[in-house]
């Protein structure tokens, strides 16, 4: 886990499938960190876009993040330039690179196709809350109260990242 203090220092080492983790300072972020016993309150995943001019590919790329969150008046799955997201974030940010063996096996076409088709899907607050309570699945009525069924009609942040 690499802490991001300067985006430009890590920009070129980022690649599709890498996870960006956020440790927010707000009340909801603090509740998430307390419930999960982790410094991370939110995650998203890297998309990279090539540069085009006059329908011709140009050298270079820009990093984007796809995430399910409430941001800029929208709630749900959004795609944002990663540099803009980092510049406007109040809290800690980490890069979690995808293991190299998994990068080699990655089917980028399926990865991009899946994620692009999730944009604008709503945020899944009920499942987000249930996921934070997964620790008690086996203690109280195993899985009955907090078990989440796979449902890709809406997403919370880590559900989107895991599905990718």
Regions found by a protein language model. Give the residues of each.
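N-terminal capping segments
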Residues: 2-41, 48, 66-70, 74-164
């Amino acid at each position: 886990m690499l802490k991001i203090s300067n985006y430009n220092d890590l920009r070129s080492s980022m690649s599709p499938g890498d996870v960006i983790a956020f440790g927010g300072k707000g009340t909801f972020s603090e509740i998430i960190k307390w419930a999960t016993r982790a410094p991370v309150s939110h995650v998203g995943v890297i998309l990279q876009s090539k540069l085009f001019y006059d329908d011709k590919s140009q050298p270079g790329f820009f990093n984007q993040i796809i995430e399910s969150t409430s941001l800029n008046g929208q709630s749900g799955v959004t795609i944002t330039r990663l540099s803009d997201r980092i510049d406007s974030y109040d809290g800690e940010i980490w890069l979690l690179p995808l293991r190299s063996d998994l990068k080699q096996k990655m089917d980028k076409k399926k990865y991009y196709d899946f994620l692009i088709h999730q944009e604008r899907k709503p945020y899944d607050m009920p499942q987000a809350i249930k996921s934070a309570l997964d620790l008690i699945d086996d203690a109280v009525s195993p899985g009955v109260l907090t078990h989440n069924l796979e449902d890709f009609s809406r997403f919370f942040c880590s559900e989107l990242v895991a599905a990718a």
